[in-house]
Amino acid sequence: MADILQMHDLKPAPGANKDRIRVGRGEGSKGKTSGRGDKGTKKRYQVRPGFEGGQLPLYMRLPKLRGFKNPFKKEYQVVNVAVLAELFPQGGEITVADLVAKGAVRNGFPVKVLGDGEVSAAYTLKGVKASASAKSKIEAAGGSISED
């Protein structure tokens, strides 16, 4: 039974675990300069992050950020008339709640209808905005749009 390899018999391969070199502990073993060379900034302390040795640093070479983010910007969810024709082929009155129920838009955001696609049925849209092309296509098919 002595030939079976057991956990306590395992040891790392020779040379796999090297001791780290402790510097600055006497002249005989990397003492004095501790591998940092003789004089200069990098011997005495670290250079700050982003320092490029006197060259104009990258963060100063790049232009400043311009403009601002408007906190009052209104983000509309868009629905094309092709999607309306697919979801409501029979036409009729459509509200934002109907679009949410069908999964076309998410709740809590304003909706805008855009004019990509064709309209065959008459839609009465309530509570949505519409682009000029969408408005003309819906009205040409006998529908109407109210934004209130």
Swiss-Prot record:
GO cellular component terms, A-Z: cytosolic large ribosomal subunit
Molecular function GO terms recorded: rRNA binding; structural constituent of ribosome
Gene3D superfamilies: 3.100.10.10
Keywords: Ribonucleoprotein, Ribosomal protein, RNA-binding, rRNA-binding
Domain of life: Bacteria
Region (Disordered): 1-47
Record Pfam families: Ribosomal_L27A
Biased composition (Basic and acidic residues): 1-40
InterPro entries: Ribosomal_uL15, Ribosomal_uL15/eL18, Ribosomal_uL15/eL18_sf, Ribosomal_uL15_bac-type
Keyword presence, rRNA-binding: yes
The keyword Thylakoid is assigned to this record: no
GO BP terms in the entry: translation
Similarity section: Belongs to the universal ribosomal protein uL15 family.
Summary of subunit composition and partner proteins: Part of the 50S ribosomal subunit.
Function: Binds to the 23S rRNA.
NCBIfam families, A to Z: rplO_bact
Official protein name in the record: Large ribosomal subunit protein uL15
